[in-house]
């Protein structure tokens, strides 16, 4: 008998949305961006691949939700000058990117998957730059500089950690020190 269209059949495991996201992030960390597929995730969870489309709409929706989960713990430190708070947000973001570098690569490949949490983080940084005395236009420019620097630094370190030549990562690289040097160029 053919099943009617609509909501997918309830999977025996009754897997929650949070469990799907946790397993998706774990699978991505294991197989990398190239090996991450809806079918592989479905097999891992023992569910129908259509389950993800029901919960997330499409692959971009799943990737966006994964990023929202990964980045949701990043917040604006409430104490300190705007510059100190910006550095705190960026160091936390760097740490999350370093924890999930393949997630960042997936987002770069699929711009429709750009997560709400990443937008929130950039808005926090932009507001703090304005509080530091920048115009909104200059703030937007510096948000791009700071966030792109953070992406590049985290991905470079993650790639070095995964390379056969440098299994321990680049121990000589100090993101906090490099960020401090860059922040000195703010002039705010």
Outline where the language-model segments fall.
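N-terminal intrinsically disordered/low-complexity leader segments
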Residues: 1-15
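Helix-turn-helix
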Residues: 19, 23-61, 65
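Short hydrophobic clusters on alpha-helical segments that form packing/core surfaces
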Residues: 20-28, 66, 70, 93, ...
